[in-house]
Curated annotation (Swiss-Prot):
Regulates membrane-cell wall junctions and localized cell wall deposition. Required for establishment of the Casparian strip membrane domain (CSD) and the subsequent formation of Casparian strips, a cell wall modification of the root endodermis that determines an apoplastic barrier between the intraorganismal apoplasm and the extraorganismal apoplasm and prevents lateral diffusion. It comes from the Eukaryota. Homodimer and heterodimers. InterPro entries: CASP/CASPL, CASP_dom, CASPL. It is a multi-pass membrane protein. The chain crosses the membrane at residues 27-47, 76-96, 108-128, 162-182. It holds the Pfam family CASP_dom. This is Casparian strip membrane protein 1. Glycans are attached at N139. GO terms for cellular component: plasma membrane.
């Protein structure tokens, strides 16, 4: 039978955190980094290989739509490649955190760098999303017609690559939250 103890005001929010409790957080960090690699690499490859050719009246006159026709799409591919490389470079550090869950300085560095990469990836994905939106809907006030009716495959490829990139944005948010949780567990007593 458990003993009933009356708590003083404020005592309920102080919890003892067992040593080694960051191992699960570190494993989840590693898994999310692997998912981030898949998302950013897939997005960069999908956009980088995205092109469609349409014949016009004859087979000698054709119109091409390629990702490098738009600066926003070029930025998107470059940013996703940079973030993918960052994910790969931080995998060993994530593995070190599994073995040594008390590594505090490297966790702080990772949180800062993860936040920088999150901002970079969000900027690149948002720039590409604005162009994809214009391609799908056009802009009637400037007489820009939607081009996805003619270049359907190109627009589908661009939209699909955005899914991978914005998925990686969500992964970064989760990684930053996990890093903050791991840092907060380093103290002997944590106020929740």
């Amino acid at each position: 039978m458990t003993k009933s103890v009356r708590l003083e005001e404020g005592d309920a929010s102080k919890v003892l955190v067992p040593v080694g409790s960051n191992k699960g957080v570190s494993v989840m960090d590693l898994v999310l980094r692997l998912v981030g690699i898949a998302g950013t690499l897939g997005a960069a490859i999908a956009m980088g290989t995205n092109e469609q050719t349409l014949p016009f009246f004859t087979r000698f006159v054709v119109f091409n739509a390629e990702y490098d026709d738009f600066r926003s799409f070029r930025l998107f591919v470059i940013v996703n490649a940079i973030v993918c490389a960052y994910f790969v470079l931080t995998l060993p550090l994530s593995i070190v955190h599994i073995m040594r869950s008390a590594a505090r300085g490297s966790r702080i560095l990772l949180i800062i760098m993860d936040t920088v990469m999150l901002a970079l990836l969000t900027a690149g994905a948002s720039a590409a999303a604005s162009i994809v939106y214009l391609a799908h809907n056009g802009n009637t006030s400037t007489n820009w017609l939607p081009v996805c009716q003619q270049y359907g495959d190109f627009c589908q490829g661009a939209s699909g690559s955005l899914i991978g990139s914005f998925g990686a944005v969500v992964v970064f948010i989760l990684i930053i939250l996990l890093g903050a949780i791991a840092l907060s567990r380093h103290a002997k007593r944590v106020v929740l």
